């Protein structure tokens, strides 16, 4: 069995432990791990008996797991491209969210930032989603292009609306783009990973033996990931607005434009740094579903009451 898949099946731990694991996996250093180092770490995991059980009590094994989990896809056993590894998500998206939430930004700047943000998140979702369904590179490329363009267009709606009908209410002006950012980010996951819902993903027993392909499991995997992504971007954009609004009422509020920009940037980066591991930890990487909730063909092919599937990041 693929070591990463074996690890996530055996490690269905509580939220706090998942959070601590993601804090390790999101270390930016993991973007630059060499292929040789990855192969050496995975060889150690292959040759170590019950390697998942030694994650906490053996530092060498723990380091090997962190290198493997942060760079290799659990479904395909292929290396994840450097730019789309989980560790790259925060440093790539945080500056975009900051620029997107800057007040009084021109429409050209908004279009460029939206395009970059949704172009990246679409590719990230496809790369780190479940890869057990049948697919080809051309159809995935066409799907990704369509999703990124449509997400960018939908994300522009509140900005275009405010340009034509400027709202008098401050909170409506500032929160409407945030609501759209959260909603479109969730919809982006649904759209970019729609093949999982239409074609089904592998469901397996606790030993990792594949029982069949389930569209219902694919739908659940996408739904959970979409929720976490909406929470991530919605909270990361809303919290700095609340902080700055409250801070304005104090005597410590800076008056220079540069100080205001630095304050907004710091609060946005802080919230993104907190919410990325929180959102990735909201649901286990290996989802669990009752066999009775799946298709009749799968129910008739196994006696297991609970089956597992890879949710994706």
From Swiss-Prot:
Organism of this sequence? Mus musculus
**Coiled coil region boundaries:** none
Bilayer topology term: Multi-pass membrane protein
Q: Identify the coding gene.
A: Sfxn4
Endpoints of the signal sequence: none
Protein name (Swiss-Prot/TrEMBL): Sideroflexin-4
- What residues bear N6-acetyllysine in this entry? 173
Family stated for the protein in its record: Belongs to the sideroflexin family.
Q: What is the purpose of this protein?
A: Mitochondrial amino-acid transporter. Does not act as a serine transporter: not able to mediate transport of serine into mitochondria.
